């Protein structure tokens, strides 16, 4: 399937297979969104959200919850797949700003640049962890922005994260013991 957004990236069999499985994953399928393209290096992704019975609201426009849910997991998954097993990646928060009602099919492009990856790797190497914001824009066929979502992702070195998590657990146990 041709991506809506022009790209120089290619989709591998592995990324095509992952995209296909994600499209049929019940929790994502229920959002009404469809992944159209997933680059082989997981740095670019394109999603479509059609206006139809599962995605429209009382006034006949795209339901805000559909816009939000169809945009949910991807930056976390892209980072997780691209950075590899030595990193921990979590979604921390997200917010949405509606610009214009969606009265037709909308598209979103997710892009993580080489500069983003370099910044992430360098910061995690020196600080152990990083929180980074990513912007998602839902646009129509004329590239008019209908909604913007900012997703905040937490990225850490796996060993740093496990140590931090262990320190937190030990602190909780110490606090509980001191209460007795």
Spans of features found by a protein language model:
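A generic structural signal for short beta-strands and their flanking turns/coil linkers
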Residues: 31, 43-45, 90-94, 104-108, ...
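Catalytic strand-loop segment that frames the active site of acyl-thioester-processing enzymes
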Residues: 30-61
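A short, structured loop/turn motif at beta-sheet edges
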Residues: 38-43, 99-106, 139-144
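Alpha-helical membrane-targeting segments
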Residues: 1-30, 54, 58
């Amino acid at each position: 399937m041709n991506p809506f957004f022009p790209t120089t990236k290619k989709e591998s069999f592995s990324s095509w297979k992952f995209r296909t499985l994600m499209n049929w994953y019940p929790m994502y399928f229920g959002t009404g969104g469809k992944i159209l393209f997933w680059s082989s290096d997981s740095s670019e992704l394109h999603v479509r959200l059609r206006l139809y019975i599962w995605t429209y609201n009382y006034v006949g426009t795209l339901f805000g919850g559909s816009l939000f849910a169809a945009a949910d997991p991807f930056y976390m998954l892209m980072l997780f797949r691209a950075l590899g097993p030595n990193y921990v990646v979590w979604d921390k928060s997200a917010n949405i700003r509606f610009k214009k009602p969606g009265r037709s099919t909308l598209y979103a492009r997710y892009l993580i640049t080489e500069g983003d990856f370099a910044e992430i790797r360098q910061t995690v190497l020196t600080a152990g962890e990083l929180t980074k914001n990513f912007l998602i824009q839902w646009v129509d066929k004329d590239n008019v922005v209908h909604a913007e979502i900012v997703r905040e992702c937490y990225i850490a070195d796996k060993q740093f994260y496990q140590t931090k998590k262990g320190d937190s657990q030990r602190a909780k146990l110490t606090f509980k013991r001191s209460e007795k």
